[in-house]
């Protein structure tokens, strides 16, 4: 059997392609059942996010797997395969396992090290499990992937630094104030960047978030999302003396030509710093404002510098996670090898039981004078001897099966004890039966 993943993501397909291959949440159970009915598929999990659609399967035939999965996608989405095949990637066995581990750890995400994908991987696995879509292989693999993803974030610092402009603005504010508790925030502009910044600030414990916009209705709409206070741009200028943090992202008016008004506001609040972040292009806030006493002004270039430094730090942490992934891949490979030992041990036990019974039958036929009690004693004694004789070989082959030469050890063990006839047809024993080097 083999592990395969077929998918597309933000690297291989633009958004107009990705949105055509997005599984609706309500349709996922049906999609999984359809996938599991696909020829050669034994287990299946579908991970579907805005940035990726990936189909993980355990199959019994590798050479036709790609064709079968593409056919499934063609049927489900109603899109001819010629229109999407060039956007697909396909990983097999070892590469498929490595890819899943990287996805779960956030190393394959658009934002390196993000944590949302880990929850999505777990949810996809649990959904498939409820739909009876996972078996021995994926139950082990996906649990291991989720555990590894948690370790990656708890044992490294990959998620502890801002890599978006909006979050970098918040991180910068924390450096100055230490905490947003008791702080008032004024946001100029109600666009996407302002919304993200307001979300981070509100989540960081700011007492009040005031939103000003040229269109008052839009200010009301954004303020309502964070239990904030809307106001007009003129009112915002009048409230400068009351706020601790100002984020400007209008790209139009901001507080240009208001140096004098800012200076007067600062005189009304002696010894209280005002933290200003200008994330607009062109800039909203005149650089001259930044030289006023107790005013800390930063623009988007300052924030991009922080983001780049943080990205470098995340890349360094990703190297550590890559090492963790390689270690976990070996753990999974060893586990796969141990699956092959079960039918071998069972075959040995069945052969030993057959020899034991036939030998006792022969002996009892030659000694008809033995009563039932004597026969039971002989049966227990000989079975105890047999079990003791098998104890060490069984424990040793269990250990060896999990090692690097596990497949070879199973083959040799099978030959030494002549177990071929006792093995179940198609039992996964020996080299080439379990594919994950």
UniProtKB/Swiss-Prot annotation:
Keywords attached to this entry: NADP, Oxidoreductase, Porphyrin biosynthesis
Record has Metal-binding as a keyword: no
Reaction(s) catalysed (UniProt annotation): (S)-4-amino-5-oxopentanoate + tRNA(Glu) + NADP(+) = L-glutamyl-tRNA(Glu) + NADPH + H(+)
Residues bound to NADP(+): 189-194
Residue numbers marked as site, Important for activity: 99
Alphabetical list of InterPro entries matching this protein: 4pyrrol_synth_GluRdtase, 4pyrrol_synth_GluRdtase_dimer, 4pyrrol_synth_GluRdtase_N, GluRdtase_CS, GluRdtase_dimer_dom_sf, GluRdtase_N_sf, NAD(P)-bd_dom_sf, Shikm_DH/Glu-tRNA_Rdtase
Molecular functions per Gene Ontology: glutamyl-tRNA reductase activity; NADP binding
Record has Cytoplasm as a keyword: no
UniProt binding sites for substrate: 49-52, 109, 114-116, 120
Enzyme Commission code(s) on record: 1.2.1.70
Subunit structure: Homodimer.
Listed name of the protein: Glutamyl-tRNA reductase
Species: Paenibacillus macerans (Bacillus macerans)
């Amino acid at each position: 059997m083999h592990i395969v993943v077929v998918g597309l993501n933000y690297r291989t397909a633009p958004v107009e392609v990705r949105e055509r291959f997005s599984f609706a949440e309500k349709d996922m159970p049906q999609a999984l059942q359809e996938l599991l009915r696909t020829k050669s598929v034994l287990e299946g999990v579908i991970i579907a996010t805005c940035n990726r659609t990936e189909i993980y399967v355990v199959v019994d035939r590798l050479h036709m797997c790609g064709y079968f999965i593409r056919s499934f996608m063609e049927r489900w989405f109603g899109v001819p395969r010629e229109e999407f095949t060039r956007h697909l990637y396909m990983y097999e066995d070892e590469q498929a396992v490595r890819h899943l581990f990287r996805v779960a750890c956030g190393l394959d995400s658009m934002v390196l090290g993000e944590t949302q994908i880990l929850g999505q991987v777990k949810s996809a696995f649990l959904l498939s499990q409820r739909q009876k879509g996972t078996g021995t292989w994926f139950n082990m693999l996906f649990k291991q992937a989720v555990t590894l993803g948690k370790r990656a974030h708890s044992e490294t610092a990959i998620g502890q630094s801002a890599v978006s402009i909006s979050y970098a603005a918040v991180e910068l504010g924390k450096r100055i104030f230490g905490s947003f508790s008791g702080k008032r925030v004024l946001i100029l502009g109600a666009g996407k960047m302002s919304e993200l910044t307001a979300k981070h600030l509100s989540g960081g414990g700011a007492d009040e978030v005031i939103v000003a916009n040229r269109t008052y209705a839009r200010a009301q709409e954004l303020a309502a999302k964070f239990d904030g206070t809307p106001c007009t741009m003129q009112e915002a200028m009048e409230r400068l003396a009351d706020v601790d943090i100002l984020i400007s992202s209008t790209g139009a008016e901001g507080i240009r030509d208001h140096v004098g008004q800012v200076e007067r506001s600062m005189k009304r609040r002696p010894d209280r710093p005002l933290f200003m972040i200008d994330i607009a292009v062109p800039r909203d806030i005149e650089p001259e404002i930044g030289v006023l006493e107790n005013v800390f002004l930063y623009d988007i270039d300052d924030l991009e510098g922080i983001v780049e430094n943080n990205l470098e730090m995340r890349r360094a942490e990703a190297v550590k996670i890559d090492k963790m992934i390689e270690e976990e891949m070996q753990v999974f490979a060893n586990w796969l090898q141990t699956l092959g030992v079960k039918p071998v041990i069972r075959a040995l036990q069945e052969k030993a039981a057959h020899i034991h019974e036939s030998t006792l039958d022969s002996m009892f036929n030659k000694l008809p004078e033995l009563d039932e009690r004597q026969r039971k004693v002989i049966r227990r004694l000989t079975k105890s001897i047999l079990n003791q004789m098998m104890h060490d070989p069984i424990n040793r082959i269990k250990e060896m099966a999990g090692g690097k030469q596990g497949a070879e050890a199973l083959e040799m063990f099978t030959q030494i004890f002549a177990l071929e006839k006792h093995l179940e047809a198609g039992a996964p024993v020996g080299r080439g039966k379990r594919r994950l080097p």
